[in-house]
Amino acid sequence: MRQILIAVAIALAVAILLTPVLIRLFTRQGFGHEIREDGPPSHHKKRGTPSMGGVAIIAGIWVSYFGTHLVGVLMDGKGPSASGLLVLGLATSLGVVGFLDDLIKLRRARNLGLNKTAKTVGILVAAVLFGVLALQFRNADGLTPGSAELSYVREIATVTLAPAVFVLFCVVVVSAWSNAVNFTDGLDGLAAGAMAMVCAAYVLITFWQFRNACATAPGVGCYNVRDPLDLAIIAAATAGACIGFLWWNAAPAKIFMGDTGSLALGGIIAGLSVTSRTEMLAVVLGALFVAEVTSVVVQILAFRTTGRRVFRMAPFHHHFELVGWAETTVIIRFWLLTAIACGLGVALFYSEWLTTVGA
């Protein structure tokens, strides 16, 4: 628990101190965000707000992770794990794709960055590498960071994927979550606040897995997760970094995370869900992100098949703005829904454990 608190504190401090530095730097460089002409009229005043603030989030997570492990090595001799480095590697790779996308947008002074093919290839490469490596690095207990068995709260033994199918599954998971968080990042502080809550839920889940790991506490209801404490540290660091960034990103935002941050944060959810064996539970925890990306898919399918739109604008947080909700009202209500979803997800996780142990 001490390491988790250290991780939160370091990440929060780095993000909250580095973000204003980036604001000044990007403002001097003229790296102002371009706004869609067909977006809500209230967003036009945001034109010129610095973007690429996700750099502060990623930096906060990395500094926190290694800072926490430096303390950990001094206390118990344990350093970074394969699971932790894989999750951070995935998030950083996606962050690089997002950074290039943001940079091109800012250089061209238009809301179009990497073309779809280049962006898709970048995400695909990161996802494939993650999927392949997730089945490597077997520890002394025979556990790898990922599992070929499909998981809800723990592995479903009746559904085992072939290695190639598992990699394809990882591609779907990574692509879905990175795009889901990316679509959600359309209102000041919405994605950062929601992400902090999802990661807080993952801290509880992975720490519980650590306290009830089969490797150290074998018995009914134990969890076969390779590095649960390290995953808890990453979740805590991400929550702290998002809160620190939110200090400057809350409405009215002084900086946006950009694709640099949103793609990286999507990678965090994808990586945590695979390495903690909770791919299906993550859909509940991240219900807001799922709803946002679903609204985009529904809008596209409806328009292509019927020529009509279901929402005034997608992602659907813009729909509520266009029907008269104030931006801050949408944000706060969506945060409340995220808190409810996270509470439900944690409750489902814990109730499954109670059922398993017969409590």
From Swiss-Prot:
GO terms for biological process: cell division; cell wall organization; peptidoglycan biosynthetic process; regulation of cell shape. Keywords: Cell cycle, Cell division, Cell membrane, Cell shape, Cell wall biogenesis/degradation, Magnesium, Membrane, Metal-binding, Peptidoglycan synthesis, Transferase, Transmembrane, Transmembrane helix. It is found in: Cell membrane. Its EC number is 2.7.8.13. This is Phospho-N-acetylmuramoyl-pentapeptide-transferase. Its cofactor is Mg(2+). Catalyzes the initial step of the lipid cycle reactions in the biosynthesis of the cell wall peptidoglycan: transfers peptidoglycan precursor phospho-MurNAc-pentapeptide from UDP-MurNAc-pentapeptide onto the lipid carrier undecaprenyl phosphate, yielding undecaprenyl-pyrophosphoryl-MurNAc-pentapeptide, known as lipid I. The lineage of its organism: Bacteria, Bacillati, Actinomycetota, Actinomycetes, Mycobacteriales. PANTHER family: PHOSPHO-N-ACETYLMURAMOYL-PENTAPEPTIDE-TRANSFERASE, PHOSPHO-N-ACETYLMURAMOYL-PENTAPEPTIDE-TRANSFERASE HOMOLOG. It holds the Pfam family Glycos_transf_4. The chain crosses the membrane at residues 3-23, 55-75, 84-104, 117-137, 156-176, 190-210, 231-251, 255-275, 283-303, 330-350. Pathway: Cell wall biogenesis; peptidoglycan biosynthesis. Its main location: membrane.
